[in-house]
């Protein structure tokens, strides 16, 4: 099955990226701030690409766009009531779904490789976040979702920027690896 071989190759490439990023961190040639900058850039570009390529010229196309974004909306709703480790799972799923909206497979591979580097740090921060910090983060996710629905790149980019400059983001400045 050719499709299966394609998935195998994509997974191998993703693991290779992850290995390179891990080695850079291990050798102190990179740091968590640079990883976060890459994640932020991937998400901003994914948002822009999704908005730019969305066909909303007809009512049917608009309905299709809303259906494409529905998983993001459901994730945001679930996030509102989440606690503990469920926060981590939903946050990760939201970021993965955001990247998927771009339909850029390379972005998805890079996002997965980069996110794997900081899973533990993010898990520690999200599970320890106060309810107020968590709700601020959920509000960022809601704004990102709404900006995609409304095709408002400026609002979406501002929300992504805010997401990565949260009050508890300083807690993430811990060594990785």
Regions inferred by a protein language model and the residue ranges of each:
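Residue-level detector of well-ordered alpha-helical segments, enriched
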Residues: 34, 38, 42, 64, ...
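Short linear motifs at protein or domain termini
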Residues: 1-42, 48, 52, 176-177
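Amphipathic alpha-helical segments enriched in hydrophobic/aromatic residues interleaved with Lys/Arg
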Residues: 57-81
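Short loop-to-helix capping motifs
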Residues: 103-105, 151-152
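C-terminal all-alpha effector/ligand-binding and dimerization domain
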Residues: 69-76, 89, 115-177
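Short basic (Lys/Arg) and small-residue
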Residues: 98
């Amino acid at each position: 099955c050719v499709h299966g071989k394609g998935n195998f190759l994509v997974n191998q490439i993703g693991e290779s990226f992850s290995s390179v990023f891990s080695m850079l961190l291990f050798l102190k040639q990179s740091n968590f701030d640079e990883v976060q900058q890459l994640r932020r850039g991937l998400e901003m570009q994914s948002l822009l690409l999704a908005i730019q390529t969305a066909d909303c010229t007809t009512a049917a196309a608009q309905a299709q766009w809303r259906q494409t974004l529905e998983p993001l909306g459901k994730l945001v709703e679930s996030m509102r009531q989440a606690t503990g480790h469920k926060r981590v799972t939903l946050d990760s799923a939201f970021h993965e779904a955001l990247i998927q909206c771009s339909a850029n497979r390379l972005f998805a591979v890079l996002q997965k490789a980069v996110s794997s580097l900081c899973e533990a740090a993010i898990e520690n921060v999200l599970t320890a976040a106060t309810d107020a910090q968590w709700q601020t983060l959920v509000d960022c996710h809601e704004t990102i979702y709404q900006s995609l629905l409304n095709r408002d790149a400026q609002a979406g980019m501002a929300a992504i920027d805010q997401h990565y400059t949260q009050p508890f983001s300083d807690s993430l400045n811990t060594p990785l690896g």
